[in-house]
Design a protein with these regions (language model features):
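An accessory alpha-helical subdomain
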Residues: 74-174
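Hydrophobic "anchor" residues on beta-strands that sit immediately upstream
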Residues: 2
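Rossmann-fold dinucleotide-binding core
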Residues: 5, 10-72
Length: 174
């Protein structure tokens, strides 16, 4: 006997696959990777355990993740993919857009340097991982929200609308 386990970033279709395979399973997702995580300070990192599947498998990973000091959250397969679309797709897409339009700066400011460091780290992620995250069925709506916000911000800039800019900044700061 065995328990199947995955740590995939997108869970779409896994529940159905697990149900067909006939083996007990456990599905988790450590929400950090080697690019940005401080592996010496895992108490600042999160892990998701899917609340479906084999009970003992879930207990095993809950114990393991607790011993590592991770913050543990339990979601369904669908809740997980919605969370990942929000928490991973938005940052990756924003980073891609930044990287696509940036050019070398001889005297970059602090904000530019920080964004550049994040962009380089994000672009060093595995291509398949990035593709998997962006092909999450819930990603499109998140990217559409970015487009909507950009359109609103561009209109404020085009109009040089100080009142609109103040309202926009108030909205995003709260």
């Amino acid at each position: 006997d065995c328990i199947l386990s995955d740590i995939s970033s997108v869970k779409t279709g896994l529940k159905e696959w697990y149900d067909r395979c006939g083996h007990p399973y456990v599905s988790t997702h450590p929400m950090f990777g080697p690019t940005f995580a401080n592996l010496n300070q895992l108490s600042e990192e999160n892990a998701i355990i899917i609340n479906e599947g084999d009970y003992m498998g879930r207990i095993f990973f809950k114990d393991l993740y607790q011993r590592l000091g991770l913050n543990i959250y339990e979601y369904s397969f669908e809740e997980h993919d919605k969370t990942v679309a929000y928490s991973l797709s938005i940052p990756f897409v924003s980073t891609f857009v930044f990287a696509a339009v940036m050019k070398h700066q001889d005297a970059p400011g602090t904000t530019f340097k920080r964004h550049m460091r994040i962009a380089k780290g994000g672009l060093n992620e595995d291509d398949y991982l990035l593709q998997e995250i962006l092909y999450n069925p819930y990603t499109y709506d998140q990217v559409a929200q970015i487009r909507t916000e950009l359109k609103e911000l561009m209109q404020i800039i085009d109009d040089k609308d100080a009142v609109g800019m103040k309202a926009y900044l108030t909205k995003i700061r709260n």
